[in-house]
Swiss-Prot record:
Protein name, as recorded: Recombination protein RecR
Organism of origin: Caldicellulosiruptor saccharolyticus (strain ATCC 43494 / DSM 8903 / Tp8T 6331)
Encoding gene per record: recR
Zn finger spans (C4-type): 58-73
One GO molecular-function entry: zinc ion binding
Cysteine disulfide links: none
Length: 199
């Protein structure tokens, strides 16, 4: 019986590593998984491995994709003169739910945060700057989260992009300070984009 308890403990520990999952939720999920049919557990494990192994970064915007270029960058109907810069891929999902923004994106994969050991060179800022130098982008909307790290990242990006002669705007404050774009509702996101200000 000890080996069984050890296996359960290991599963709980792994589930706790997921964002937003505490010990009680991890425990609940672990016991749920153990009670699932073997074929369902296998399908879940295969889906996780498949997503992990087949997902890579878009060569243009650094969003997650299964091909070399994501479906947004390859869409000819998108407005290529405007790029919305976000911290994480899930921010793209949140902004796309609004169905109003028709430009392109760039995913930084984080925000500048020296206290958390996250520096500009660890983000995809160099890819963004090269992209801006090689294309006819007229406006960059900075849609980083309205927290200390997001504001620092926005200021840093604005200092780099403005000398390129590109208009730099920041999403409006409809999203609460300290909040994440990912969790905002569609109307709030739409108002934040519509009310963006030049920085």
């Amino acid at each position: 019986m000890q080996a069984k308890e050890n296996a359960i403990s290991k599963l709980i520990q792994q589930l706790e590593k997921l964002p937003g999952i505490g010990q009680k939720t991890a425990q609940r999920l672990a016991f749920y998984i153990i009670n699932m049919k073997n074929e369902d557990v296998k399908a879940l494990a295969e889906a996780i491995l498949s997503a992990k192994n087949s997902t890579k970064l878009c060569k243009i915007c650094c969003n997650f994709t299964e091909g070399d270029i994501c479906h947004i960058c390859s869409d000819d109907k998108r407005d290529r003169s405007i790029i919305c810069v976000v911290e994480e891929p899930q921010d793209v999902v949140a902004l796309e739910k609004v169905k109003e923004y028709k430009g392109l994106y760039h995913v930084l994969h984080g925000a500048i945060s020296p206290l958390k050991g996250k520096y500009p060179e660890q983000l995809t800022i160099d890819v963004l700057l090269k992209r801006l130098a090689d294309t006819n982008v007229k406006e960059v909307i900075i849609a980083t989260n309205p927290d200390v790290d997001g504001e620092a990242t926005a200021s840093y990006l604005a200092r780099l992009i403005k000398p390129m002669g590109i208009k730099v705007t920041r999403i409006a404050r409809g999203i609460p300070v300290g909040g994440d774009i990912e969790y905002a509702d569609e109307v709030t996101i739409l108002k934040a984009i519509e009310g963006r200000k030049e920085i």
